[in-house]
Amino acid sequence: MTALNELTLAEARDGLKAKDFSAREIAQAHLDAIERAKALNAYIVATPDRALKMADVSDEKIAKGEARPLEGLPLGIKDLFATQGVHTTAGSKILEGFEPHYESNVSSQLWRDGAVMLGKLNLDEFAMGSSNETSAYGKTISPWRRQGSDTPLVPGGSSGGSAAAVAAHLCLGATATDTGGSIRQPAAFTGTVGIKPTYGRCSRWGIIAYASSLDQAGPIARTVQDCAILLGSMAGHDPRDTTSVDVPVPDFEAAITRGVKGLTIGIPKEYRVEGMPAEIQRLWDQGADWLREAGATVREISLPHTQYALPAYYIVAPAEASSNLARYDGVRYGLRVPGRDIAGMYENTRAAGFGREVKRRIMIGTYVLSAGYYDAYYVRAQKIRTLIKRDFEAAYASGIDAILTPATPSAAFGIGEMASADPVEMYLNDVFTVTVNMAGLPGISVPAGLDAQGLPLGLQLIGRPFDEETLFAAAQTIENAAGRISLPKAWWA
């Protein structure tokens, strides 16, 4: 029999409904797995007491025939989502000891639908990173290893804890956020599925902000179906978030059976970047063949402003971050380091509380927003953003239903391998993903194969605004063709 923590979310849902096992049993199985996997450092804090109490409530609901959509399903929550009464850190020392008096909209909707909270998942500090190495609470280690090697690998970032926990069977699914690829890149690195919905599909209320015009919540899970189930509960209009869009939430799970017959898939020629590994190119070609064999038409398209996306993103995102992070000053909550006066306290608190990468991005953002450089950098970057959005609009207007690209330019790299590199080398991990955020579009990463060293590689599908259903249909087609990627033996247990 499959261990309870190794079931897919859909299998666990069906098993709970059939009363094959209890919500308490599956919660305990995950808590035991979390305890055995401390070497991965996927969780900043586990919440076993809360998990078992929530599971007991779920068992009562199931016994009464009142099961809700996610009844009894154990989930992990990225520690960027405010959770009432539970330590919420954003992976930063500056929020040490912070326990919110409120719940994020996304997590409250998951609890409304009966999900069980296992704990808070590790992440790059304030979601700024692509490797989960910038967390003040230690690096998260990927459960994957290269064949014949003990070198610890990064799980990707910023949602590295979410991706690692899902891949290592430490939760059935997890919440995550994506500002420039922070759901899709770690999903690709860990052989999991991650969807960044359309901007405005999920409420940002109660999510600690990085770049407000780019941030979007979404799920990471082990299958396309599981992601569809979770997004159905996470999505929805929230009047407390002015960027939340009031559109109906479709049945995402039903969309996975649609298939791709009659769809037109675009292959952007600008994504064939210099130095792309041959195995990434082969996988991309294979993905196009799978979709073609399933009945889709595949044709080349042009997104001419792609080359400017990464530099524009790394102007817009730090600019918004420098504004958003100005609120952390040690006055109301979190870390406080005394100074000679109030200004000294601000300086000391921020100097001690923020990590190196966060400070770098605050400084970049402050610089590009300064009087002498605002027009030269920030205004130009916003103009590029508009041109990127128009490129996608033109592609979809020409009859394209979805766009297929690689999810990442490589497989996962080793912990510390980028430590001495130019920061721009790390930023290049987002080369295939940032355009989606700049244009506010939905994008999904689905596992499609392994590299020569046995590490997972993902393909990305990009859709029209608020057409996640087509992405789920196409992603399911790729998952069916590629087969489920199995995690290697648990070396950490």
Swiss-Prot record:
Gene3D superfamilies: Amidase signature (AS) domain. The active site is at K78 (charge relay system), S158 (charge relay system), S182 (acyl-ester intermediate). NCBIfam families: gatA (TIGR00132). The gene is gatA. PANTHER family: GLUTAMYL-TRNA(GLN) AMIDOTRANSFERASE SUBUNIT A, TRANSAMIDASE. Keywords: ATP-binding, Ligase, Nucleotide-binding, Protein biosynthesis. This is Glutamyl-tRNA(Gln) amidotransferase subunit A. It comes from Methylorubrum populi (strain ATCC BAA-705 / NCIMB 13946 / BJ001) (Methylobacterium populi). GO terms for cellular component: glutamyl-tRNA(Gln) amidotransferase complex.
